[in-house]
Amino acid sequence: MSRYRGPRLKKIRRLGALPGLTRKTPKSGSNQKKKFHSGKKEQYRIRLQEKQKLRFHYGLTERQLLRYVHIAGKAKRSTGQVLLQLLEMRLDNILFRLGMASTIPGARQLVNHRHILVNGRIVDIPSFRCKPRDIITTKDNQRSKRLVQNYIASSDPGKLPKHLTVDTLQYKGLVKKILDRKWVGLKINELLVVEY
């Protein structure tokens, strides 16, 4: 299954708030219909929705998500927490959390167009896994700095997670440590994703 490129508000109405997908919010009370399902289908639907939240928020394909679940399953710690740590340490997500891009798809585009450096080297793979003490900067040219400048100026420094620091004057971000569960930017029950 390929990456979702369709109407984003439709997904937000169905799954709830997905800050990485878009900044838009649906109108209040639009198309809120109550549906009643049997108990067994209800459990399946809840697990599917949690999985879809994760997929659409981080912009993953089905295959990528399965690969991350497989890697997290091999770890000795809680599979759900390791899964969220893997997803949060992706380069496109870190750019979004630093405030260098308005959404995760916007951050993917910055990375794909070679505007981002990690430890002084150009990285053009959005799924690049960042490690503690990685320094993320923009290229030195004016165009790259201008793209990031608007987003950094409008971002809220109070929303910056504790595992990241940002220097707004030099357009530089630093990954201090691996993310703690309470700083994940999405309200999700990761155990239901692993069970699915």
From Swiss-Prot:
Region of interest (Disordered), ranges: 15-43
Q: One Gene Ontology cellular component annotation?
A: small ribosomal subunit
Q: Name one GO molecular function term.
A: structural constituent of ribosome
The UniProt entry, under SMART domains, shows: Ribosomal_S4, S4
Is Protein biosynthesis there in the keyword field? Answer: no
Query: Taking every annotated instance into account, which residue ranges of this chain make up the domain S4 RNA-binding?
Result: 89-150
Q: Known Pfam families for this protein?
A: Ribosomal_S4 (PF00163), S4 (PF01479)
Q: Where in the cell is it found?
A: Plastid, Chloroplast
What are the record keywords, sorted? Chloroplast, Plastid, Ribonucleoprotein, Ribosomal protein, RNA-binding, rRNA-binding
Query: Which GO biological process entries does UniProt record here?
Result: ribosomal small subunit biogenesis; translation
* Entry keyword annotation includes Chloroplast: yes
Query: Where does this chain mainly localize?
Result: plastid
**PANTHER family per record:** 30S 40S RIBOSOMAL PROTEIN (PTHR11831), SMALL RIBOSOMAL SUBUNIT PROTEIN US4M (PTHR11831:SF4)
Physiological role? One of the primary rRNA binding proteins, it binds directly to 16S rRNA where it nucleates assembly of the body of the 30S subunit. With S5 and S12 plays an important role in translational accuracy.
Summary of subunit composition and partner proteins: Part of the 30S ribosomal subunit. Contacts protein S5. The interaction surface between S4 and S5 is involved in control of translational fidelity.
Name the chain's protein. Answer: Small ribosomal subunit protein uS4c
Originating organism: Bothriochloa ischaemum
